[in-house]
Each structure stands twice: as structure tokens, then as C-alpha cells.
Design a protein with these regions (language model features):
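Hydrophobic membrane-insertion alpha-helices, especially the h-region
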Residues: 10-21
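Surface-exposed, hydrophilic segments of mature proteins
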Residues: 8, 27-255
């Protein structure tokens, strides 16, 4: 497909949150998706999702059903700061800025999970982010001491609504006080690889340098990115890891 046709590619991406309730055992815990909340005891959280407004001058609540198109520019290139969050200036970058607020009365540790379709990662090439069809990222500020842990894979594969996903997680290492929001986002957005195209047979392809490879996923059907957050009481624990280990909350909320 020529460059002109690439410009009209548009895939609906529904960056949704799907609810899955975890066990609570004897500890106060809470879970939250973008639209659903389960509360147990004195811990309560809100998963906040935001995007830049049309003028790119302020953050506003995230809206579903974005058009996902190949990125123009680089997500690691020129950045801008909007409401304290560093974000890529690249065109066709889809903001999904995820923070968590402690809306309860007790200090709490929090963590977040993101599910990405397995078929949109790594293709037939070595396991490295540069070979993803669908990319996602967080800025370096979130890796500072006391902020978010490095991203880990907690499950692969997991089937959600008939689609195979790989589940990623990050944990906020500092306990959140009542009404406090994580100082940095866990994730800031998603983007389609700049080489994504459609061939003459209608197959979606990606090219990482060795010619187009067919993607084993029909992007015409859209992409769902489930997101899930968990919280556990901080009282009695010296670290987020210890608190979540004792809580009994599932490490894969969609299992």
C-alpha cells in the first residue's frame, strides 16, 4: 500500500476497563476500573483516566472509541508538559493518562494492570518493544524513587472476551494518604507502529525492516485495552509488596 493510502487508515480503539473482583481475605482492599468500583472495608480508590483537550493545553476526562492510526513522528521525540505531565508531541499518539486516587479514609498501597492483545506484540521477531504493533509507554518521571515500579508481565496468555492478552502491572511504592493521587501517571498512552499498513489482500501488515509481515489480528474490529486497579490497606505493612502479598488480591485480575 502506498503512503497516500496509509493516511486514511483508521482503527477504532476502545481503551476500556473491564471489571474483575478479587478476594479480600482479612485485609481492607479495593479494586477499580474506569467505570466500576468494588469496595471492601475502609479502602476505596478511583482509577482516573485523562487525555489532552483538542488544543493540547489542559487535561480532560478520557473519552472512548478513539481512531487509532500509525504514529507520525516519535513518541520518544519532542515532548510537552500539560498540567504537570510530560507527553509526546507526535501526531496520532492516543493519550490514556492513568493515575489512581485514594478516595477512602485510610492510607493505601495501589497497583495497576493493563491488558494488551498478544497478537499486537513482537510479531515474528525478537522479544523487544520496538517490534510491537501496538506500543504503549510511560514517562521517566514515573520511575523515580517512591513512584512506580518497573513494568512486569504477570500473565501471558489470558483470554478476555475471546481475545488472548498479555497482562502487565506496575505498583506505586509509596502509600497514598486519604484524597491523595499518585504523583505521576502509571501509563500515558498508546500508539500504532508507523509501519502498519494493509496489503492488496486486505491483510494488516507491519514492517520492521525485513518487508511486510501479516499481523495475526484484524485491526478493523478495533482494539480493546482493559485496565484495572487494586488497593490494599497500608497499616501494618512496611511495603506495597508485603501488603499485596498478604491481601490475597489476584495478581491477574482477569484470571
Amino acid at each position: 500500500m502506498n503512503k497516500k493510502k496509509v493516511l486514511v487508515l483508521a482503527v477504532s480503539v476502545c481503551l476500556v476497563a473491564i471489571l474483575a473482583i478479587g478476594g479480600t481475605l482479612a485485609y481492607f482492599t479495593d479494586t477499580d476500573s474506569a467505570t466500576n468500583t468494588f469496595t471492601a472495608g475502609g479502602v476505596k480508590i478511583q482509577l482516573i483516566e485523562q487525555q489532552r483537550n483538542d488544543a493540547r493545553t489542559a487535561l480532560e476526562p478520557f473519552e472512548q472509541n478513539k481512531n487509532l492510526m500509525p504514529i507520525v513522528g516519535s513518541a520518544q521525540g519532542e515532548q510537552q508538559v500539560v498540567d504537570g505531565v510530560k507527553l509526546p508531541k507526535a501526531q496520532n499518539y492516543v493519550d490514556k493518562i492513568m493515575t489512581i486516587k485514594n478516595t477512602g479514609v485510610s492510607d493505601a498501597y495501589v497497583r495497576i494492570f493493563v491488558a494488551v492483545p498478544t497478537a499486537l506484540q513482537n510479531g515474528q521477531t525478537p522479544n523487544a518493544p520496538r517490534y510491537d504493533v501496538l506500543h504503549w509507554n510511560f514517562n521517566g518521571d514515573s520511575c523515580a524513587t517512591g513512584e512506580w515500579t518497573d513494568e512486569i508481565v504477570v500473565a501471558n496468555p489470558t483470554v478476555i472476551n475471546g481475545v488472548e492478552y498479555k497482562i502487565y502491572s506496575r505498583t506505586y511504592t509509596t502509600a497514598l494518604a486519604a484524597n491523595e493521587v499518585t504523583a505521576t501517571p502509571a501509563y500515558i498512552g498508546f500508539y500504532l507502529d508507523k509501519t502498519v499498513d494493509q496489503n492488496a489482500d486486505g491483510d494488516w501488515t507491519v514492517d520492521w525492516g525485513n518487508g511486510p509481515e501479516v499481523i495475526n489480528y484484524d485491526l478493523s474490529d478495533g482494539v480493546e485495552i482493559p485496565v484495572f486497579a487494586q488497593a490494599v490497606q497500608a497499616a501494618g505493612f512496611d511495603s506495597a509488596e508485603a501488603a499485596f502479598t498478604a491481601s490475597g488480591l489476584p495478581e491477574n485480575p482477569w484470571a
